[in-house]
């Protein structure tokens, strides 16, 4: 599992049932936007291991063009994107301080369609009951897939709630 340093990284860091060497994160770096390129590198270095990226939509969109790299090199990577249509950390900070949040919100993007446009798998989830079928499709398939979870921008991580 690979995770970048955005707002959604809090939740990925608290997943159980994995060894420390199976969870790679760049939280110490402190900037979003590196998760996808990091996951590609891990998948290339560990071709025998199934790599899963968990990232936010803001960070993912900073390197979405790398979907072409994934397709060209035949990398089987599962990309899970928590899509709140915003830069999660920033929107919560702006709200607490009473500032205009339009600079942190950018509208809902259909990232599953973007992935399909690159010839990869793409699923937008509306409920968790769809997970089993998507999981079976990914496991039995030979190509990368992007799972686009449209989530609320109103929920802040416990860390963010303490900071704000």
PLM features per residue range, with description:
Residues 9-10, 30-32, 60-61, 85-89, ...:
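Short gly/pro/ser/thr-enriched loop/turn and capping motifs at secondary-structure boundaries
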Residues 11-17, 64-66, 89-94, 157-162:
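Short acidic, glycine/serine/threonine-rich loops at helix termini
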Residues 48-136:
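Conserved thiamine diphosphate
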Residues 95, 131, 135-164:
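Glycine/aspartate-rich loop-and-adjacent alpha/beta segment that forms the canonical ThDP
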Residues 1-48, 161:
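Active-site diphosphate/adenylate-binding microenvironment
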């Amino acid at each position: 599992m690979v995770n970048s340093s955005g707002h959604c990284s809090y939740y990925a860091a608290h997943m159980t049932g994995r060894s420390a060497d199976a969870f790679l994160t760049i939280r110490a770096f402190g900037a979003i936007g590196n998760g996808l390129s990091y996951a590609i590198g891990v998948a290339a270095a560990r071709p025998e291991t199934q790599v899963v990226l968990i990232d936010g939509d803001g960070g993912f969109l900073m390197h979405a063009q790398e979907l072409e790299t994934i397709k060209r090199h035949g990398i089987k990577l599962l990309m899970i994107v928590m899509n709140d249509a915003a830069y999660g950390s920033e929107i919560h900070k702006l709200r607490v301080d009473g500032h205009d949040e339009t600079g942190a919100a950018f509208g809902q993007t259909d990232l599953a369609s973007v992935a399909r446009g690159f010839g990869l798998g793409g699923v937008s989830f509306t409920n968790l009951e769809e997970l089993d079928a998507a999981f079976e499709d990914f496991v039995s398939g030979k190509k990368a897939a992007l799972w686009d979870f449209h989530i609320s921008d109103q929920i802040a991580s416990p860390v963010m709630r303490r900071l704000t």
